[in-house]
């Protein structure tokens, strides 16, 4: 019983500490937004991958970085409308 409580407590601690880990009420849209933003940050943080994208798109590295940052605003589009509760 204590082992189960400890694991649950550790999970709650991680979820409160890190934004992208989600929680019980995380929607599919929020989860996908976190994944996409994490991917875009990784692309910008790895210099060689950024060079690869710049060559593939025939753009400068600064333009590719700017485009990735623009995509981070709403990577999955606007959130879906929630059904109203009566």
Curated annotation (Swiss-Prot):
Modification Phosphoserine occurs at:
9
- Give the positions of the site Interaction with RNA: 5, 20
Q: Cite a single Pfam family from the UniProt record.
A: SF3b10
Do you know which InterPro entries this protein is assigned to?
SF3b5/RDS3-10 (IPR009846), Splicing_factor_3B_subunit_5 (IPR017089)
- Residue span of the signal peptide, if any? none
Biological process (GO) annotations held by this record are: mRNA splicing, via spliceosome; positive regulation of DNA-templated transcription; regulation of DNA repair; regulation of RNA splicing; U2-type prespliceosome assembly
N-acetylthreonine modification sites are 2
Q: Which UniProt keywords apply?
A: Acetylation, mRNA processing, mRNA splicing, Nucleus, Phosphoprotein, RNA-binding, Spliceosome
Which GO cellular component terms are attached? nucleoplasm; nucleus; precatalytic spliceosome; SAGA complex; spliceosomal complex; U12-type spliceosomal complex; U2 snRNP; U2-type precatalytic spliceosome
What this chain does, per the entry, is described as: Component of the 17S U2 SnRNP complex of the spliceosome, a large ribonucleoprotein complex that removes introns from transcribed pre-mRNAs. The 17S U2 SnRNP complex (1) directly participates in early spliceosome assembly and (2) mediates recognition of the intron branch site during pre-mRNA splicing by promoting the selection of the pre-mRNA branch-site adenosine, the nucleophile for the first step of splicing.
Query: Quaternary arrangement and interactors, per the entry?
Result: Component of the 17S U2 SnRNP complex, a ribonucleoprotein complex that contains small nuclear RNA (snRNA) U2 and a number of specific proteins. Part of the SF3B subcomplex of the 17S U2 SnRNP complex. SF3B associates with the splicing subcomplex SF3A and a 12S RNA unit to form the U2 small nuclear ribonucleoproteins complex (U2 snRNP). Within the SF3B subcomplex, interacts directly with SF3B1 (via HEAT domain) and SF3B3. Component of the minor spliceosome, which splices U12-type introns.
Family label: Belongs to the SF3B5 family.
UniProt name for this protein? Splicing factor 3B subunit 5
């Amino acid at each position: 019983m204590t082992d189960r409580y400890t694991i649950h407590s550790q999970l709650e601690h991680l979820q409160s500490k890190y934004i992208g880990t989600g929680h019980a009420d995380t929607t599919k849209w929020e989860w996908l937004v976190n994944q996409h933003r994490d991917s875009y940050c990784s692309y910008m943080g790895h210099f060689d991958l950024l060079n690869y994208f710049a060559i593939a798109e025939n753009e400068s590295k600064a333009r590719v970085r700017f485009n990735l940052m623009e995509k981070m605003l709403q990577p999955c589009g606007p959130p879906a409308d929630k059904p109203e509760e009566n």
